[in-house]
A protein has these predicted regions:
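Sec/Tat signal peptide C-region and signal peptidase I cleavage site
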Residues: 15-20
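Repeated loop/turn-to-beta-strand initiation elements of outer-membrane beta-barrel proteins
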Residues: 22-24, 62-66, 110-113, 168-174
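Outer-membrane beta-barrel "beta-signal"
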Residues: 23, 192-204
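Membrane-embedded beta-strand positions of outer-membrane beta-barrel proteins
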Residues: 24-28, 68-70, 101, 117-119, ...
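Transmembrane beta-strands of outer-membrane beta-barrel pores
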Residues: 28-34, 72-76, 98, 107, ...
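Extracellular/periplasm-exposed beta-strand and loop segments of Gram-negative cell-envelope proteins
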Residues: 32-46, 75-96, 126-159, 182-195
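Hydrophobic, lipid-facing positions within transmembrane beta-strands of outer-membrane proteins
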Residues: 48-54, 97-101, 115, 119, ...
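Outer-membrane beta-barrel proteins
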Residues: 57-62, 103-109, 166-168, 180, ...
Length: 204
């Protein structure tokens, strides 16, 4: 998995070295994380995320291109109750990097507006994954998934999206990342991370 992440990062550096179109992106993600314990029915745990990063699009031939990027992501989820400013439950927070390597095809609809279809893998590397418990407003124990070696830092998803670009300056992307790899290291738990994303970008 480390080799895959290194190859993806190398693809980003390659696109920087050539005459590539550069984007600055910020976005929001709605996580739909599939969790299954043993033979029990899987459940979906939702989360929220914000992202920021840069990407470069290299035109291959005609309307085809390859876009590679590097993004920072902060993801959080709260499960519990809160009353009289006292909360009981658990707060999970994830920080990480992702490298999308997406093939795209452009459909020019007007002189100043283009639609693109994007498809390809997205590689994730986790920096921090912690869950903090609270009882009656008091902070309890903290579980660090990486220190406890419960989860893999590396993850791969299949990404697809539709982008709109106008005036050669602005763009938006509506995308979906389908989690492929099981990031939980135990044999009794299945955990895959998927996310619906909305991104705004500025074109340099």
């Amino acid at each position: 998995m480390k080799k895959i992440f290194a190859i993806a990062a190398a693809a980003l550096l390659f696109t920087c070295a050539v005459n590539a179109q550069t984007y600055f992106n910020v976005g929001y993600g709605y996580g739909m994380n599939k969790v299954q314990f043993g033979n029990l029915e899987p459940e979906t745990v939702s989360s929220n995320a914000i992202t920021a990063g840069i990407s470069h699009n290299f035109a291959i031939d005609g309307n085809f291109g390859i876009e590679a990027g590097l993004n920072y992501m902060h993801d959080w989820n709260w499960e519990g109750l809160e009353a009289n400013d006292k909360k009981t439950g658990a707060m999970s927070r994830f920080d990480g990097l992702n490298v999308p390597v997406l093939v795209n095809y452009a459909f020019p609809l007007a002189s100043d507006f283009t639609v693109k279809a994007l498809l390809g893998p997205k590689f994730f590397y986790g920096l921090s994954d912690k869950t903090t418990t609270y009882a009656g407003g008091e902070k309890g124990y903290v579980v660090n998934s990486y220190d406890d070696e419960n989860c893999s830092r590396f993850n791969v998803s299949a990404s697809a999206g539709i982008a709109g670009e106008w005036c050669n300056k602005f763009r938006f992307i509506l995308g979906y990342d389908l989690g492929i790899t099981d990031i939980d290291k135990s044999d009794s738990v299945l955990r895959k991370q998927s996310m619906l994303t909305f991104t705004l970008g500025y074109i340099f």
